[in-house]
C-alpha cells in the first residue's frame, strides 16, 4: 500500500520547450524538497532543454 507522504514519490518532468514531452522518475523528498529541474534531451525538438517537476 502506497503512502501519501512516501519518501520517494514518482514525479513527472515536463519539457519547458512547450512540446509536452515528459519523463517519469522518482526523487527523494528528504534530499530534494524543492521542485526538481533537470537538463534532459527532448526528442521532439532534438535538443537538450530544462525539464521541470510538475505536480
Curated annotation (Swiss-Prot):
Annotated GO CC locations: cytosolic large ribosomal subunit
Pfam family of the protein (one): Ribosomal_L33
The keyword Membrane appears for this protein: no
Molecular function via GO: structural constituent of ribosome
GO-annotated biological processes: translation
Signal peptide annotation: none
Xref: SUPFAM superfamilies: Zn-binding ribosomal proteins
Disulfide bridge partners, by residue number: none
Residues annotated as transmembrane: none
Protein origin, superkingdom: Bacteria
PROSITE patterns membership: RIBOSOMAL_L33
Entry keywords, A to Z: Ribonucleoprotein, Ribosomal protein
Protein family (similarity comment): Belongs to the bacterial ribosomal protein bL33 family.
NCBIfam families cross-referenced by the UniProt entry: PRK00595.1, rpmG_bact
UniProt name for this protein: Large ribosomal subunit protein bL33
Species of provenance: Arthrobacter sp. (strain FB24)
Amino acid at each position: 500500500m502506497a503512502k501519501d507522504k512516501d519518501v520517494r514519490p514518482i514525479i513527472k518532468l515536463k519539457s519547458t520547450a512547450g512540446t509536452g514531452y515528459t519523463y517519469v522518475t522518482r526523487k527523494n523528498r528528504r534530499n530534494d524538497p524543492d521542485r526538481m529541474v533537470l537538463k534532459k534531451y527532448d526528442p521532439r525538438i532534438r535538443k537538450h532543454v530544462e525539464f521541470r517537476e510538475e505536480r
